[in-house]
């Protein structure tokens, strides 16, 4: 089941070079350490067992631990000219036979437990019963956020008080899904452990209202609905929800997900017949036919190595969101055995993943590494040109935008810069955390739900009708 980026075609032979040559431009020989780093789940973060067992209980009382943030001083601009630890493009070694398993997104045992019950709110707890106490209703809540036959909604925090709704579900910690959630929110929120940690850290929501769902385990909600969270292959902490209503209907809400093979290999699909699926249709268009993440990562590593031969003193800047894109920069750090420089707020977020090996790769000191992670908006030609001036020890900066939104042609198989100057190269990488059109089709044909409801880019009646015809065709073909 493990996703091993290093098994991609010819990648080992292209990167695993043992020779240590003198680099005249650097005046020193730099050889990457051939050490094996024992790390968890950056790319193989689901370890699925085919056998489903029934356990007796599930503990929901564990307190969430916020990350312990160290506070080293930021790098001094006066030391910006200090020579960085450049690698030689001819002496890059893979430090491990397998891709670094940074970022322990999930420990997915594949076990279904008996339906442990969540406690109901006490009648004398006015704050709990008061429900949403934050912002006022900011529009009508879309129908696809309500789970039929239950008192549950998914990713619906920006619509104010919703009558008859007892429980709120958060699929992952991206702002378009938690928008409207604040420290004043006082209704039960169900999510993964990582997402709960981020909600507590960043939004200061009272931990009493955060209920952690263990992956691949059934739990019973106060209204009698059973729910199971399963990995969504989207970003750390992202999950899909399967609801089993009191009338026996199985409803899947995907949230945002990437339906690569690792998702289809989850044996839950063999155990449960899905009646209704609320489907992430972000890229439900034949034009969006981008490669699998492991292929994109391999291509990016090839591009970087080739770039280093032209510009040995290369600075690499990768755009990222608050959470997401970890696989991309972790793969680069592993291939070239370097630190990962992140901003202080990003460090706090990554510490919520509770991954010691990842922390060992991280640094706040820009002078310590040539691999910097910055917000997407900072990766532009103008900003990177100015950024390079601050660090004159580098001769060129490669900006990487790992998102399908950033590229002009989503069907191209080879990576090509979309903007390049003497000082800056901008590379759009079709690294998506949403399903491609082909992956959506394969998922639908595999799960074969009775009804499909699109949740993205489906606000118009004509669009919904067109998607319905597409879904019907997929099921007929499959």
Predicted features, each with a name:
Residues 173:
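Catalytic glutamate of the conserved HExxH
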